[in-house]
Amino acid sequence: MAIKSLKFRRNLYYLPVFGELLLLALQTHLKDADGLVPVPLHRWRQALRGFNQAHELARFISHRSGLPIAKNVMRVRATRTQSGLTADERKQNLKNVFELAGQLTIRRPVIVDDVMTTGETCNQLARTLLAAGAERVHVLIIARAQHADFTPADGS
């Protein structure tokens, strides 16, 4: 409920709570990270929503950690919202959607997003970053949602 309120109602007062949790995870597990890449929204979706929650989370983390935010990663094509799509539809929806304007200066980026369902958004963005020269890519998310197509590794 709080994540949806942040994402869709622009209730930024949740930002410090989520930001602190992500910062703790970053400082504990991702000490080799050298920059942040918030999942970009397409310009019309950002205009419609009024902000990008992933970018706001990354700004919070950047301010507290000193890590730079990559400003040249873009979503170049408007896509359907991922909610309600199957895993295959999500993959097709996000194909070739991210691009870099110029060089990637961060070698060990951390993708910042709010919720991961199938992981396809982060997967496609990570592929773009690796193709641009990233050594490895990590992901920081607030929550992992269970999707109908999701099967845990243990098969349960």
Q: Can you name each region flagged by the protein language model?
A:
Residues 1-60, 83:
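Extended interfacial segments that mediate partner engagement and assembly in macromolecular machines
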Residues 24, 28, 59, 63, ...:
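Short, well-ordered alpha-helices that flank and scaffold nucleotide-derived cofactor binding pockets
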Residues 31, 63, 104-105:
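Short loop/helix-cap segments at secondary-structure boundaries that form the rim of catalytic
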Residues 56, 66-68:
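Short secondary-structure boundary micro-motifs
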Residues 68-156:
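PRPP/pyrophosphate-binding module of the type I phosphoribosyltransferase fold
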